[in-house]
Amino acid sequence: MKYIVILGDGMADKDIPELGNKTILDVAKKPHIDGLKGVLGMARTVPKELKPGSDVANLAVMGYDPLKCYTGRSPLEAVSIGINMKETDVAIRCNLVTLSDDEDPKKRTMFDYSAGEISSEEARELIEAVERELGDDEFKFYPGISYRHCLIWDNGKTGLDLTPPHDISDRVIGEYLPKN
């Protein structure tokens, strides 16, 4: 038997005051989804020990134990763009972003975590330029889609304290720069 798994990733959203403090999903006309409400229950897909996110939840829904195999979103994204990783490789998401132009890089503000929804073609040119300037036997930059790219670190360090750019929109980036 074949199955189709449909994940409504991010569908819950946040309450919107203009919609009477309801979500877009609350006010949308969706008779088929509403019909499932009486048939389905709730499931915890993300273990309490892990931060909720689509990466962790998708692993669990597909039958993997995130507590045993989850090391971050980046290895999943690396594989999704065709990167063959070695056991000793560490994948790090490499986003193109838009920052303010303050002279001190630590005082710059994250204006846009998606570089203005940069096109994949423009982004490829930038990541290839970064690879030419910074890539070597240890660090390799790979173009992905739009603002989302990948850095593979050969024999890299794990357990880094990294903050996703979308978590710090409109904030000064200094305290969120990589640590360890």
Regions found by a protein language model. Give the residues of each.
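Active-site nucleophile/metal-coordination loop of metallo-enzymes that catalyze phosphate/sulfate
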Residues: 2, 12-134
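Residue-level marker for buried hydrophobic side chains located in beta-strands
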Residues: 4-6
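Glycine-rich, mobile lid/loop segments that gate access to catalytic sites or pores
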Residues: 110-180
